[in-house]
């Protein structure tokens, strides 16, 4: 929570993944689908270890671990397939316990909700 010097306004900043929703497994499965589509076979445990990194960093780490070179063009395509595969799984995402109550409480106290992507 942050309070500005010249105002009584409050601001709350949440990292969506792991704070409000749990999407780890959906990301793992989406990355597996994307890497397989590029001909890169990886066990899910290897992908799971990299979750939390940006897509580019994750692909660099996986390339180092596997000794495979991934071009910028290939990386862009893999990330696009990941985004599409993840979107296909959106209906399986679940709000973490207490997250909705927290957001409702903030709304009841007239705390503005803003999205930052």
Where are these regions (language model features)?
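Short loop/turn motifs at secondary-structure junctions and domain boundaries
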Residues: 3-5
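Conserved small/polar residues in nucleotide/adenosyl-binding loops
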Residues: 114-117
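N-terminal helical cap/lid subdomain that shapes the substrate entry/recognition surface
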Residues: 7-16, 20-100, 105, 109-112
């Amino acid at each position: 929570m942050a309070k500005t010097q010249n105002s009584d306004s409050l601001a709350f900043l949440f990292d969506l993944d792991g704070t409000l929703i749990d999407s780890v497994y959906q990301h793992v499965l989406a990355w597996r689908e994307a890497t397989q589509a590029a001909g890169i076979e990886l066990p899910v445990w290897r992908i799971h270890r990299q979750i939390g990194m940006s897509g580019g960093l994750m692909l660099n780490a996986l390339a180092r671990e596997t000794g495979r070179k991934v071009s910028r063009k290939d990386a862009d395509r893999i990330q696009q397939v990941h985004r599409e595969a993840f979107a296909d799984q959106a209906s399986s995402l679940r709000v973490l316990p207490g997250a909705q109550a927290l957001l409702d409480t903030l709304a009841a106290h007239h705390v503005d909700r803003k999205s930052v992507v």
